[in-house]
Amino acid sequence: MTVEYETKQLTPAQIKIILDTVPILEEAGETLTQKFYQRMIGNYDEVKPFFNTTDQKLLRQPKILAFALLNYAKNIEDLTPLTDFVKQIVVKHIGLQVLPEHYPIVGTCLIQTMVELLPPEIANKDFLEAWTIAYGNLAKLLIDLEAAEYAKQPWRWFKDFKVTRIVQECKDVKSVYFTPVDKDLLPLPKPERGQYLCFRWKLPGEEFEISREYSVSEFPKENEYRISVRHVPGGKISGYIHNNLKVGDILKVAPPAGNFVYDPATDKELIFVAGGIGITPLLSMIERALEEGKNVKLLYSNRSAETRAFGNLFKEYKSKFGDKFQAIEYFSEDNNTDDKIVIDKAFNRKLTTDDLDFIAPEHDVYLVGPREFMKDIKEHLGKKNVPVKLEYFGPYDP
């Protein structure tokens, strides 16, 4: 489905129609977006790989779209307040490799869902025309912004990479190394520290490809990318990686993406807070910060010593960089804090917000972990006016 969008000026009457939709979206926006996704995913196979079934079941994707539609309607006369949010959408779309031909599918399903759910006296001809123009303007904005970002990328769409090594990092984490099949991609394009790669997986027995994003867990050496994956019970992709993936297999990989990246310009002390496998995008940042002579403090929370990845790497950092590097660890289900694993300090309990009381606006804070973990920490530090850089995988929380 190919449509060339052009920006069209909404009339005052059409602007009023969009603004009058705000109460409807406030009351029933999530119902509308749930129906929208059911319609789109049920009827258009080409968009199915973009969507994580867990995010759909937990209603993350419908919630974020409802939030986006509501705020687009509220700000239809001036989108300036949505600048940062639009940038987030663009970053996510680039990572997933959303293309211009996907936008008409979204627009068609959105209008059809409005017709289905809203009474005809509301979803009349004028209403549908106003929202068709409004959506077209938004699509044009996003397509143009994404085209500018795609032009910067070292390749387009998903390229074949061959698995070169698989390393067991701890009980339930494996690192996978892979290099491009197409030698024209060498030397390997370097990501910014903290970025991720999107993969398309075609698993045995699955009708459609599945997309997953994994952080680049080591700054590339020897023309290899590395990701490190925790085995999640019941997880289709993590289970496949841990139980079936082998050296020589081919992976479909999109270019590095994401705006959660290391800022080398800072002269502040750096605080890295990681929950479990959230450590992966932080590894190359920590490495670079220490190489630059900066003070780095890591707060690292895991269930147990058995499920704590990269402990030996952090011991190497301690040996090499001394007091420039401090690692404080938390094991929520383990009583093993003997000298063999402790780097600076270790506690047999969960990391809590009380452990962050020393953090002040004079620190630069990077945070990655489970959603609730990040939400609690961000809220706590926000009360102290401490800015936090963080990464959500999947839909952003509003």
From Swiss-Prot:
Induction description: Expression is under the control of the CDA4 transcription factor. Induced by nitric oxide, high-iron conditions, during transition to filamentous growth, by contact with host macrophages, and during oral infection. Expression is repressed by HAP43 and CWT1.
User: What is one cellular component GO term in this UniProt entry?
Assistant: cytoplasm
Q: Does the keyword Iron-sulfur apply?
A: no
> What does the entry's cofactor note say about binding and number?
Binds 1 FAD per subunit.
Q: Any idea which UniProt keywords this protein has?
A: Cytoplasm, Detoxification, FAD, Flavoprotein, Heme, Iron, Metal-binding, NAD, NADP, Oxidoreductase, Virulence
Q: Where is this site: Involved in heme-bound ligand stabilization and O-O bond activation?
A: Y37
Which compartments is it annotated to reside in?
A: Cytoplasm
User: Where would I find the FAD-binding FR-type domain in this sequence?
Assistant: 156-263
Which residues does the record give as NADP(+) binding sites?
A: G276, I277, G278, I279, T280, P281
Q: Where does FAD bind?
A: Y196, R212, E213, Y214, S215, P395, Y396, D397, P398
- Does this UniProt record's set of keywords contain Cytoplasm? yes
Cofactor(s) for this protein?
Answer: FAD; heme b
Modes of activity regulation:
Inhibited by imidazoles.
> Residues in domain Globin?
9-147
Catalytic activity, per the record? 2 nitric oxide + NADPH + 2 O2 = 2 nitrate + NADP(+) + H(+); 2 nitric oxide + NADH + 2 O2 = 2 nitrate + NAD(+) + H(+)
Annotated active site: Y103, E146
Annotated residues for binding of heme b: H93
* InterPro entries assigned: Cbr1-like_FAD-bd_dom (IPR008333), FAD-bd_FR_type (IPR017927), FNR_nucleotide-bd (IPR039261), Globin (IPR000971), Globin-like_sf (IPR009050), Globin/Proto (IPR012292), OxRdtase_FAD/NAD-bd (IPR001433), Riboflavin_synthase-like_b-brl (IPR017938)
| Annotated site (Influences the redox potential of the prosthetic heme and FAD groups) | K92
Disruption effect?
A: Leads to increased susceptibility to neutrophils.
Region (Reductase) residue ranges read 155-398
**What role is this protein assigned?**
Nitric oxide dioxygenase involved in NO detoxification in an aerobic process, termed nitric oxide dioxygenase (NOD) reaction that utilizes O(2) and NAD(P)H to convert NO to nitrate, which protects the fungus from various noxious nitrogen compounds. Therefore, plays a central role in the inducible response to nitrosative stress. Plays a role in virulence since nitric oxide is generated by macrophages of the host immune system.
Question: PANTHER family from the entry?
Answer: FLAVOHEMOPROTEIN
Domains: what does the record tell us?
Consists of two distinct domains; a N-terminal heme-containing oxygen-binding domain and a C-terminal reductase domain with binding sites for FAD and NAD(P)H.
Family of this protein? Belongs to the globin family.
The protein in question is named: Flavohemoprotein
Source lineage: Eukaryota, Fungi, Dikarya, Ascomycota, Saccharomycotina
